[in-house]
Amino acid sequence: MAEVEETLKRIQSHKGVIGTMVVNAEGIPIRTTLDNSTTVQYAGLLHHLTMKAKSTVRDIDPQNDLTFLRIRSKKHEIMVAPDKEYLLIVIQNPCE
C-alpha cells in the first residue's frame, strides 16, 4: 500500500494536477485528494463513462480492451487508467 501512496503523491506533485482519485469496480471512491462532493460527482460519472467506453471498444473488437481514457475540455483534462478492480482518475489543467 505504501507503493500506491507514493505513486499518488508523485502524480499529485506534477504541475497542473488538480486532484487524483482511485475508484473501485462499483464506482465508489476509495482514495481522493478532492473534496467529497466533487469526488462523488466525478467518480460516478467517470465510472459510468469508462464502462461505456470499455464496452464500445469490445463491441468493435472483442479481442481488444480499453487501456486509457483521456478527456480534454476548456477547463480540465481528465485522464482515466482502468484496471480490473480500480480506476485511477487524474484531473489537471489542460494548459499545463
Curated annotation (Swiss-Prot):
GO terms for molecular function: dynein intermediate chain binding; microtubule motor activity. The gene is DYNLRB2. High expression in heart, brain, placenta, skeletal muscle, prostate and small intestine; moderate in kidney, pancreas, spleen, testis, ovary and colon; low in lung, liver, thymus and leukocyte. One of its GO terms (biological process) is microtubule-based movement. SUPFAM superfamilies: Roadblock/LC7 domain (SSF103196). The keyword Cytoplasm applies. Its main location: cytoplasm. The lineage of its organism: Eukaryota, Metazoa, Chordata, Craniata, Vertebrata. Belongs to the GAMAD family. Gene3D superfamilies: Dynein light chain 2a, cytoplasmic. It comes from Homo sapiens (Human). The modification N-acetylalanine is found at residue 2. GO terms for cellular component: centrosome; ciliary tip; cilium; cytoplasm; cytoplasmic dynein complex; microtubule. This is Dynein light chain roadblock-type 2. Homodimer. The cytoplasmic dynein 1 complex consists of two catalytic heavy chains (HCs) and a number of non-catalytic subunits presented by intermediate chains (ICs), light intermediate chains (LICs) and light chains (LCs); the composition seems to vary in respect to the IC, LIC and LC composition. The heavy chain homodimer serves as a scaffold for the probable homodimeric assembly of the respective non-catalytic subunits. The ICs and LICs bind directly to the HC dimer and the LCs assemble on the IC dimer. Interacts with DYNC1I1 and DYNC1I2. Self-associates. Interacts with DYNLRB1.
